[in-house]
């Protein structure tokens, strides 16, 4: 009985696809672009921050000046790693193994030096000005994420004024909107360390 149902379903003609309206295409493109936002921040940097922040800030208490300095150092170090990881990329070698490298002005410098790239591949992986803009925006997004963290804000601003509170709530939102719009308009083509490699 079940086999008969399956064969009947398989034999039904598929309904013709209705062409998508302009609004549907825009919405689809927006959602597709939003998927690229996951590449904004290296997961390792964010995870390191989330693990170490409560420890270094003593759950936001920061009892000593050393705690505050260590918190500033952690935020700066993670932001710098977001900047640097923006210049990493990956490629599949002829055996299908993923190789990571650093984008340079002359192409991709594969970290273990096991493969040499063709001239066409070198051109594809060259460092561009847009990579620097992505790196700076990645740092800004990380600073916005860290400003939303209650441990950081309580540590660095234990008794904030009304003006400081306003800045701490609105600035990360503004940074997120501007950087998000930029990344949707100009998505990164790099698949760095911690980012998934597509079949392209």
Swiss-Prot record:
Pfam families: DUF679. One of its GO terms (biological process) is dehiscence. Keywords: Endoplasmic reticulum, Membrane, Transmembrane, Transmembrane helix. Expressed in leaves, stems, flowers, siliques and roots, especially in the vasculature. It is a multi-pass membrane protein. InterPro entries: DMP. It is found in: Endoplasmic reticulum membrane. The keyword 4Fe-4S does not apply. It comes from the Eukaryota. GO terms for cellular component: endoplasmic reticulum; endoplasmic reticulum membrane. The chain crosses the membrane at residues 37-57, 69-89, 129-149, 167-187. Belongs to the plant DMP1 protein family. Involved in membrane remodeling. PANTHER family: PROTEIN DMP3 (PTHR31621), PROTEIN DMP7 (PTHR31621:SF6). This is Protein DMP7. It comes from Arabidopsis thaliana. The gene is DMP7.
